[in-house]
């Protein structure tokens, strides 16, 4: 979806591109050969990388069974959509940029604009579908396991294409202004004010708000779980410092005949806590050291282990035991905090990339139609904004697939042609 025409800057009317309002901007139709060569190389490289990256994601999901799940079906559908952008839209957009004017005729222009808006909108809405799937998975993990079916994924994917279709078709049915087709060298989407609001909010602003809410709640839910784990670890460490590790706490009452076949009893130490059974000591309410002694049930009778004084001295090292548990607790605490930092980083990359690529474009797309006589966009800035939005189709497979270890393993198999041998 182009915001501005490829070239704007002198004193002739510039050919506006999709989602451009024209305004009081001007441009040149003739460009230098060096500009065409450099632009062709840059845009050709971008298109090639976008095609290759998204094709690899699709191939990985199709060939690797471990990747064939609902979450990855959504990522695969996103890759297919971005592949369509790369193959059907970007070559014509690059030609428009290189030649600095539209040369393919009005019918092709209408088709180009429809495909542009349809595919780019569907790509953005796929990001919403992935966010929604992740939100359900993390906030309702038990029930959503049964609801997370291929049919639900297909419904979400169909909805993204339906909304994209509803946004891309109206200009072809007449929702445009008479000036939209006045310049044969320009290929522009409808500059109608009503359609501008309808298309920009439907394709970006509402999805952006939805993604911010969903990923905000995902972060809060993930942070709550992580901090709950940290508190549990800290509580376990506190219990250990008082001499009661989870493995040594009774699971049933002492007289629980219907309970487990093993019990643990505390008896007052005769050695003031210097000796212990099974390597654990804990304090009683009155400060006396209690030795933990195993009691095993055999049939209907109880066999008592001999007291330490009877079985001989069994030295223990409660201090060492405590230090070890403290180290374990600290390690788990650090792991939990690392997970929280990774969550923040991942969500930051997802939202940061999406906003960086598309927000400048849609700000211009929304503002320009309402300030035709007073707005001016520099040539270079207009081109950067246009292609920054398109580059999101290149970055999506990197963010959603290449950072995933399962996908990395599948890509290695593809490179080494292991699937070919199979």
From Swiss-Prot:
Keyword Magnesium: no
Function in brief: G-protein coupled receptor for 5-hydroxytryptamine (serotonin). Also functions as a receptor for various drugs and psychoactive substances. Ligand binding causes a conformation change that triggers signaling via guanine nucleotide-binding proteins (G proteins) and modulates the activity of downstream effectors, such as adenylate cyclase.
Residue interval(s) of motif DRY motif: 133-135
Membrane topology qualifier: Multi-pass membrane protein
The protein, known as: 5-hydroxytryptamine receptor 1A
Span(s) of short sequence motif NPxxY motif: 396-400
Complex and partners: Heterodimer; heterodimerizes with GPER1. Interacts with YIF1B. Interacts with GPR39 and GALR1.
Domain of life: Eukaryota
InterPro entries named in the record: 5HT1A_rcpt, 5HT_rcpt, GPCR_Rhodpsn, GPCR_Rhodpsn_7TM
Pfam name, any one: 7tm_1
Chain residue ranges for the region called Disordered: 1-22, 235-262
Keywords noted in UniProt: Behavior, Cell membrane, Cell projection, Disulfide bond, G-protein coupled receptor, Glycoprotein, Membrane, Receptor, Transducer, Transmembrane, Transmembrane helix
Cytoplasmic compartment segments: 60-73, 133-152, 217-346, 404-422
Compositionally biased region (Polar residues): 246-261
Residue intervals on the Extracellular side: 1-38, 99-107, 175-193, 371-378
Positions bound to 1D-myo-inositol 4-phosphate: 314, 345-346, 352, 403-405
Residues reported in the UniProt entry to bind serotonin: 116, 120
Organism: Pan troglodytes (Chimpanzee)
UniProt-annotated location(s): Cell membrane; Cell projection, Dendrite
Glycosylation sites: 10-11, 24
SUPFAM superfamilies: Family A G protein-coupled receptor-like
Parts of the chain that traverse the membrane: 39-59, 74-98, 108-132, 153-174, 194-216, 347-370, 379-403
Keyword Transmembrane helix set for record: yes
GO biological process, one term: regulation of vasoconstriction
A GO-annotated cellular component: plasma membrane
